């Protein structure tokens, strides 16, 4: 998220919100109030939201309230990865795009099955670019330029 310019929202005085398995767990009413205030103000200013809050064995918590969605900018997108368990908005529907007040709510059921193809293509592209960097462009022969930052950082010394 951060490598793409996104930011995680952190509620001040956060409790430990994860189980050992990395899932969200139930939070206190005080935390929920702080979270709602932070989300409400933040959502008015941003274009893309990615929701992932899941609680094992339970319906996903509704963390983006209807009133928050109504105050978002038209054209904004909520990408709800918790759709399989009901979603983090009340509008989320599995494998559907719902438009509510100009905001698109995308309820992706199984994003993980779609990632391997993209990840493989990205890895192949990165590997190709790295190996291409080892070649002299004029002669086509291997030329390990130790002054190239990428090559220098990948050498085992």
Region locations from a protein language model:
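Glycine-rich phosphate/diphosphate-binding loop of Rossmann-like nucleotide-binding domains
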Residues: 1-42
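Conserved active-site and cofactor/substrate-binding residues in soluble primary-metabolism enzymes
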Residues: 3, 30, 34-45, 63-67, ...
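Residues at the C-termini of beta-strands that transition into short coil/loop
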Residues: 12, 82, 109
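Short gly/pro/ser/thr-enriched loop/turn and capping motifs at secondary-structure boundaries
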Residues: 16-18, 84-88, 112-114
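Glycine- and other small-residue-rich loops at beta-strand/loop junctions that grip anionic moieties
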Residues: 28, 53-57, 116
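ADP-ribose/adenylate-binding Rossmann-like module
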Residues: 48-106
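Adenosine-phosphate binding glycine-rich loop
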Residues: 89-157
């Amino acid at each position: 998220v951060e490598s793409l310019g996104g930011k995680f929202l952190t509620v001040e005085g956060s409790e430990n919100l994860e189980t050992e398995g990395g899932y969200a767990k139930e939070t206190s009413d005080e935390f929920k109030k702080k979270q709602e205030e932070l989300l409400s103000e933040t959502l008015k200013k941003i274009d893309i939201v990615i929701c992932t809050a899941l609680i094992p064995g339970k319906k996903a918590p509704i963390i983006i309230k209807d009133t928050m969605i109504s105050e978002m900018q038209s054209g904004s997108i909520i990408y709800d990865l918790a759709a399989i368990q009901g979603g983090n908005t009340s509008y989320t529907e599995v494998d559907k795009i719902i438009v509510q007040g100009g905001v698109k709510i995308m309820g992706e059921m199984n994003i993980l099955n779609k990632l391997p193809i993209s990840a493989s293509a990205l890895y192949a592209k990165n590997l190709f670019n790295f190996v291409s960097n080892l070649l002299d462009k004029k002669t086509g022969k291997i030329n390990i330029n130790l002054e190239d930052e990428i090559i220098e950082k990948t050498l085992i010394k």
